[in-house]
Amino acid sequence: MGEHYQYLIDRFKDAQKQFADLPHEQQPEVMGDISWVCMFDMLHYAYQHLEECKLILCCSEGTRFSGLIDEMVEIEVEGTHAYQRVLAELGRPPPPLDPTLEHILITGMFHTFFELVIHEMPLPDAENYVKEMRAFYTAGWMKIMGQ
């Protein structure tokens, strides 16, 4: 299970790095694009390794694998803060965001995503749901960020 846990974490970290490495002026134009490509990649990976990924998501309590979503949330929170600093640098500072609300929203996003795997949605449906999730979460974050 370790290799599957690590793949998901590393793929997500890579997407965060790709976005952070973009020129700051370009980041608002593509906000969400890289991370949602990453979500599709993680979805396909999880479906290719369904049993192992479901074990991580559903049966890993008490093991080192139980923190997958929490670790991803921490990475996303850090990325969100970095993006807020970029927006401020560009003269488009976002309004303050309550840290508890931020944590709840990000945690909810990952739980929503991984529900597709847990419930073994047919892959074409899951792909469509990820597209819908992208529209929903991107619009919400744009509103919260005052963009």
PLM feature spans:
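Amphipathic alpha-helical packing segments from all-alpha helical-bundle domains
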Residues: 33, 37-48, 63-89, 100-107
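Solvent-exposed, amphipathic alpha-helical segments
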Residues: 7, 11-18, 52, 108, ...
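Amphipathic alpha-helical segments used for helix-helix packing
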Residues: 15-20, 24-26, 45-63
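Alpha-helical structural segments
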Residues: 1-21, 37-41, 67, 71-74, ...
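Hydrophobic/aromatic-rich alpha-helical bundle segments in the mid-to-C-terminal region
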Residues: 83-136, 145
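Short, flexible, glycine-rich and Lys/Arg-enriched loop motifs at helix boundaries
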Residues: 10-35, 83-93
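C-terminal/domain-terminus segments
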Residues: 56-73, 125-141
